[in-house]
């Protein structure tokens, strides 16, 4: 069985990051995140949103890691976060599920792809 600890550390790091500083060192150069709207954004774009203060993270809690699978130098994970944040002054309280792809780059696991659900995850569907 593959060691999932580095992926778990990345998930926990993302879940507990309070600003944009976690993102750039922990993503691949071609990283994209797909927002609930379906629109993709690069890591630099996400950092720009945080730095502009349009996006203000108030709290984030990892509720559950549903799955981690590793296949050589590629891995994927599915996890749910309880997030409170404000976007352009409007507060959101979301229970969102993330699906992420990770790549092992020179021995270091990094986020390569992230897709976030709308903030209405029903945890009973994961039982």
Question: What do these predicted regions represent?
Answer:
Residues 6, 20-71:
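A solvent-exposed, acidic/Ser-Thr-rich amphipathic alpha-helical stretch
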